[in-house]
């Protein structure tokens, strides 16, 4: 992808079964703010009111639980203020693992749908060290959620890593996506068939829809007459939405 198409923001869209249970997890465990509820969708973000993640409730009549590994392996969240992670841990919500980094603590948590999130504030999350003994974190009554964070990385489980890399090759290293090779019957399931990652919305620094469409020639694309966005679908049936930041 050219310099004109640098990603400013990535917003994952996740299909969920129970909106209430998932909202409790995203707001209480991860510290997100409920920005807007509209229809089956909920827009989540931080205190700057910038959308960072969307959940869409999809009843069992339309979607089902994933069999085997999910398409979404992990979402990594980068927090601006390290001390706010301690505030989240002080709320005594269940987490999978707590880590120590140079700037402070980090943790990994699992949503009611089985989606894994790593929350940290480090320059490099690879430097995090898993803690065997978890310290006691004080409750911070004044804490009302994360001031600012962004989606740093989305890790996808794919049946063939080289095939996935070939599809995404035109984007270069401008998209915050990594791949992990796995085996699973639902890794190529239809987009709305399972409670899984259904879309990633990308806001681009400069959005030239004709140039982007040419770059992605031969792929499944949709561009409206207004040319305000471009919608592509990757080999895992995950929708990729591109628009001007």
Question: Each predicted region: which residue ranges?
Answer:
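Hydrophobic, helix-prone linear segments
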Residues: 1-50
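N-terminal beta-strand motif that seeds the catalytic metal site of vicinal oxygen chelate
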Residues: 1-20, 75, 126-165, 197-200
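Conserved short beta-strand elements that form part of the metal-binding/catalytic scaffold
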Residues: 33-69, 116-124, 169-206, 226, ...
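Short, conserved charged micro-motifs
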Residues: 21-23, 82-87, 162-166, 207-213
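Vicinal oxygen chelate
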Residues: 93-150, 174-181, 188, 214-245
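Extreme N-terminal leader/targeting regions
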Residues: 71-97
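Conserved active-site tyrosine of GNAT-family acetyltransferases
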Residues: 22-27, 114, 164-169, 237
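Short amphipathic alpha-helices in soluble, non-transmembrane regions
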Residues: 25-29, 88-93, 212-219
